[in-house]
Amino acid sequence: MIAITLPDGSRREFPGPVTVAEVAQGIGAGLAKAALAGKVDGQLVDTSYRIDRDAELAIVTDKDADGVDVIRHSTAHLLAYAVKELYPEAQVTIGPVIENGFYYDFAYKRPFTPEDLAAIEKKMTELARKDEKVVREVWNRDEAVALFESMGEKYKAEIIASIPADQEIGLYREGSFVDLCRGPHVPSTGKLKVFKLMKVAGAYWRGDANNEMLQRIYGTAWARKEDQEAYLHMLEEAEKRDHRKLGKTLDLFHLQEEAPGMVFWHPKGWQVWQAVEQYMRGRLTDAGYDEVRTPQVMDRSLWEKSGHWQNYKENMFVTESEKRDYAIKPMNCPGHVQIFNHGLRSYRDLPLRLAEFGACHRNEPSGALHGLMRVRGFVQDDAHIFCTEEQIVAEAKAFNELAFSVYDDFGFKDVKVKLSLRPDQRAGSDEIWDHAEEGLRLALRACGVDWEELPGEGAFYGPKVEYHIKDAIGRSWQCGTLQLDLVLPERLDAEYVSEDNSRKRPVMLHRAILGSFERFLGILLENHAGALPAWLAPEQVVVMNIADSQAEYAESVVQLLQKQGFRAKADLRNEKITYKIREHSLQKVPYLLVVGDKERDASQVAVRARGNVDLGVMPVSAFVERLKNDVASKA
């Protein structure tokens, strides 16, 4: 007898081996029809998978995240099937699941056009409606290589040939199409009902620029039509909010070919930057951090000691002077260790919190650059905490509370926390890792935070906490990190004198809340669609006169506001007031003040809030109080 334990704890017994589909059928016809895959002892498998031992089983349907991934993976194969039907000379390569969809790379004699995509999507719909069975076959490697070579599929044959000879090869067949895949896949193409092809782009074979250029078709697939419609609406909204467009429209920044991945900040954009930096500087000072500054360029020998030269050199900008090799720093941590090492440290000095708004440079591939979101030159709200093992929990707890408070001030209320745990290849003993991981858990628990654990996702030198913020249109962005480092203090010989006069290595916590300033400002712009809250807006107030006779009064109002610390300017141009109001409204200025003879004579201003909200006429002092409250409350 084989005993199958279901997620609710109930058990079902079968006289012999049984498939996932048969178990689902035994539970009910509805579940059998809905089944897309199974999870046997935590492993995702096809519904045709035979269970020949006692096991735990969950039936995967389109209500599960795993089910949606199976749909997307299967739709990638459906895409390849359709392409081969329409363009038999095209060669298939790889087709993985990505966030919200999938892609498939093809080698073809010409680029696919938008008309091609429409035809391919139509063919996919036809093939799905045929409801052909998707069948898994097991082949040995050499036979599988021969099969794909006979079909003229040189890329697929190359992939299979790189697999060890003793490893079984899984092939999936649907109709006349066969493809290499680990699976699992839906039981039949009829399960694939909601999908859309999005775009085509170029991609190098195996990601190597020295190889052939392929055609990458991107698509999205969902369990329900309303989910896809919501996603497509989100994409439309994201297009409207694109920070690159906003940067141009609002005159905040630009990028140009002579400095790829580097940002030219215009006066208004730099005002926003400064507002964010000064805010963060204040928060760090209040939290007991000391701000430092470390060199941009340091000798190769330091990067060799830290391990960056051996493991990260391809991402570093290097230079040579007077027969010495240097690197422009890609990160601040080695420099901070040098400050820690300058002079003898005592346990009484710990925790030592060193912060730096450090400019870093990384040689990112040109094809990966994307506005402010992916750059080569960037500044981080970087800091490193040097502490004892006993101080890990308290320091992690304090950082977690600070991070959540900062995100709240910037308007991000929905924050998800993920804890990345030890990988198979790692430095340090299991005992040290146990202590480090449990310390981070205790800190999160003490803050009342829920978190998701990611086994095997930690860096080789320590576990990590990630902070993911959700924006106004539902996108998630990973910004903050708290990385425990068990290796760098050893590499760079950092030590302190302990209470018993012995020398010990400090624990090093790498931490950032915003991450890259450039990227965070891009996220802020898109979150607010450019309409930044008053405390961050580059221009908080514009004062406009109706006629020349009010120009002097308008100037005096601006001077008063500037003395109060507000970012205010006057628009005294000889233009119609409606024109000026419209122009500054498009620039998303939080407050527009209009002054005519009546307002001048009464020392008042007519106030319009962003969104064409008429707040009426009020004394200048009343408006000042209103703006002060907005800034103080981060409204």
Swiss-Prot record:
Cofactor note: Binds 1 zinc ion per subunit.
All copies of domain TGS, residue ranges: 1-61
Location (main, coarse): cytoplasm
SUPFAM superfamilies associated with the record: Class II aaRS ABD-related, Class II aaRS and biotin synthetases, TGS-like, ThrRS/AlaRS common domain
GO biological process terms, semicolon-separated: threonyl-tRNA aminoacylation
Keywords of the record: Aminoacyl-tRNA synthetase, ATP-binding, Cytoplasm, Ligase, Metal-binding, Nucleotide-binding, Protein biosynthesis, RNA-binding, tRNA-binding, Zinc
Residues bound to Zn(2+): C333, H384, H510
Region described as Catalytic: 242-533
Subcellular localization(s) per the UniProt record: Cytoplasm
EC number(s) stated in the UniProt entry for this protein: 6.1.1.3
Cofactor(s), by name: Zn(2+)
One Pfam family linked to the record: TGS
GO cellular component, as recorded: cytosol
Origin: domain of life: Bacteria
Enzymatic reactions: tRNA(Thr) + L-threonine + ATP = L-threonyl-tRNA(Thr) + AMP + diphosphate + H(+)
InterPro entries: aa-tRNA-synt_IIb, aa-tRNA-synth_II, aa-tRNA-synth_II/BPL/LPL, Anticodon-bd, Anticodon-bd_dom_sf, Beta-grasp_dom_sf, TGS, TGS-like
Entry's Gene Ontology molecular function annotations: ATP binding; metal ion binding; threonine-tRNA ligase activity; tRNA binding
Job of this protein: Catalyzes the attachment of threonine to tRNA(Thr) in a two-step reaction: L-threonine is first activated by ATP to form Thr-AMP and then transferred to the acceptor end of tRNA(Thr). Also edits incorrectly charged L-seryl-tRNA(Thr).
Entry similarity comment: Belongs to the class-II aminoacyl-tRNA synthetase family.
Quaternary structure, from the entry: Homodimer.
Name of this protein: Threonine--tRNA ligase
Lineage: Bacteria, Pseudomonadati, Pseudomonadota, Betaproteobacteria, Burkholderiales
Gene (UniProt): thrS
